[in-house]
């Protein structure tokens, strides 16, 4: 069954188990918070903020940070509003689809942007537009952090990825290539390969690199020159 992000029950269940089956995410988030300590204070865009878990971590770890959280799920945003209420004017939450960011009013000199497990729902054209919009809303030397699912590039490589996912305790872990493709389709996931994401970042004007890649999970970073 496809993920129903508009269903309050599904949103609550996801919020309760957001790192289950993804052992790389906790370490990537820890690394994100460490790097953000060196980032200038100011607005941080949270693309696909969901239930506000990442925003809360950032606000707790960086006193000068303000978060503009964007998400298309009203159910997720309701959880985020409750979670982030105590932070008052440091948080602004907006219901917005990542496929139509040009409709969003956002600061144009943000110090950073983060996208955690959100961009893999976009096709390549939509992904390119989201990256370019993000670039345009960052201050010179602003950072873009992407923590997300990555495409497994070819069927003949799948068994190696399957074994790694099994060792890491990732779930679900389809046994074969056809099962993997079916799982992606059912969930509406369209992950891009590392090289594809880096290409989109460079096209937009970012200096970029894959900071940490573990099979089909990775942390990629881009920085606007300035």
Residues covered by each model-derived region:
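Conserved class I S-adenosyl-L-methionine
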Residues: 1-38
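Class I SAM-dependent methyltransferase SAM/SAH-binding core
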Residues: 45, 51-100
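Short conserved loop adjoining the S-adenosyl-L-methionine
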Residues: 100-107
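A conserved beta-strand element that flanks and buttresses the S-adenosyl-L-methionine
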Residues: 114
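Short catalytic micro-motifs in class I SAM-dependent methyltransferases
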Residues: 117-118
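A short glycine-rich, Lys/Arg-flanked "PGG" loop and its adjoining helix->strand segment in the class I
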Residues: 128-140
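C-terminal alpha-helical "lid/dimerization" subdomain adjacent to the S-adenosyl-L-methionine
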Residues: 147-204
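Core SAM-dependent methyltransferase catalytic element
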Residues: 204-226
């Amino acid at each position: 069954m496809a993920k129903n992000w508009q269903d309050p029950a599904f949103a609550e269940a996801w919020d309760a188990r957001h790192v289950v089956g993804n052992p790389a995410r906790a370490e990537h988030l820890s690394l994100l918070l460490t790097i953000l300590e060196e980032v200038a204070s100011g607005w941080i865009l949270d693309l696909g903020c969901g239930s506000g878990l990442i925003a809360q971590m950032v606000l707790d770890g960086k006193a000068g940070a303000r978060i503009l959280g964007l998400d298309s799920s009203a159910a997720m945003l309701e959880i985020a509003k409750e979670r982030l209420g105590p932070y008052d004017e440091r948080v602004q939450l907006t219901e917005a689809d990542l496929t139509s960011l040009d409709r969003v009013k956002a600061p144009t000199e943000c110090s950073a942007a983060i996208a955690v497990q959100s961009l893999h729902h976009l096709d390549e054209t939509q992904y390119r537009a989201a990256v370019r919009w993000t670039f345009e809303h960052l201050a010179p030397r602003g950072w873009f952090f992407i923590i997300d699912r990555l495409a497994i590039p070819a069927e003949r490589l799948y068994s190696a990825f399957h074994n790694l996912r099994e060792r890491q305790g990732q779930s679900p872990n389809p046994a074969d290539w056809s099962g993997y493709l079916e799982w992606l389709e059912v969930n509406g996931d369209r992950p891009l390969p590392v090289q594809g994401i880096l290409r989109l970042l460079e096209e937009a004007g970012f200096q970029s690199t894959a900071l940490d890649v573990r099979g089909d999970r990775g942390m990629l970073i881009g920085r606007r020159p300035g």
